[in-house]
Regions:
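Compact, glycine-rich, soluble single-domain proteins
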Residues: 31-51, 69-70, 77
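Mixed-charge, glycine-accented linear interaction segment located at domain edges/termini
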Residues: 99-145
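Hydrophobic residues on conserved beta-strands that form the core of alpha/beta folds
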Residues: 4-5, 75, 107, 121
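Beta-strand residues in well-ordered beta-sheet regions across diverse protein folds
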Residues: 18, 95, 109-111
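A residue-level detector for short acidic-glycine micro-motifs
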Residues: 6-9, 82, 98-100, 126
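Catalytic strand-loop segment that frames the active site of acyl-thioester-processing enzymes
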Residues: 1-36
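Hydrophobic beta-strand-centered segment that forms part of the acyl-chain substrate-binding groove
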Residues: 50-95
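Hydrophobic core residues within well-ordered beta-strands of beta-rich domains
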Residues: 1-3, 92, 106
Length: 146
């Protein structure tokens, strides 16, 4: 599912994307005939993922490594300034700013706007290549520990 239409600007710390999919009646995030404002978090997460891919593409020329897969593990301080997104006529502008991190985690702050109107904002944490953090899988023949 790709909700974003274009990247309008980006650098090593920021990305700005645009989307019109919030008005699409077939938007996969719609429920009960509406697209709630909290769905804006998915728009922001997709912008963060695109930012990571763009950074990895620039780095991969030097390192020949495949991009790290990221997992959104936390959103904090989210403030919703509207109830829904599907009734907005203006395009969504999604801005994410990388505010910190290391080789295993990335921290972002994000906002969504429709024109000058702030729709929501918050912070997110992403873990990169989390497969190493997975719990060991139990076999079907091994009884659970009590």
């Amino acid at each position: 599912m790709c909700l974003l239409e274009r990247v309008s600007a980006w650098d090593t710390r920021h990305i700005r994307c645009e989307a019109n999919s919030h008005r699409d009646s077939a938007n996969p995030l719609r429920a009960h005939g509406r697209l709630g404002a909290a769905c804006g978090i998915e728009y922001a997460a997709q912008a963060m993922a695109v930012h990571g891919a763009l950074l990895a593409e620039t780095d991969s020329a030097a390192t020949s490594q495949r991009p790290a897969m990221g997992y959104l593990v936390s959103v904090r301080g989210v403030t919703l300034h509207v109830d829904r997104l599907d009734d907005l006529s203006a395009a969504l502008s999604i801005h994410a700013e990388r505010s910190g991190g290391d080789s295993g985690t990335v921290l972002y702050s994000f906002t969504l706007h429709a024109g000058p109107r702030l729709l929501l904002g918050g912070r997110a944490a992403v873990i990169l290549d989390a497969h190493g953090l997975a719990l060991p899988q139990r076999s079907a023949t091994t009884p659970p520990k009590s």
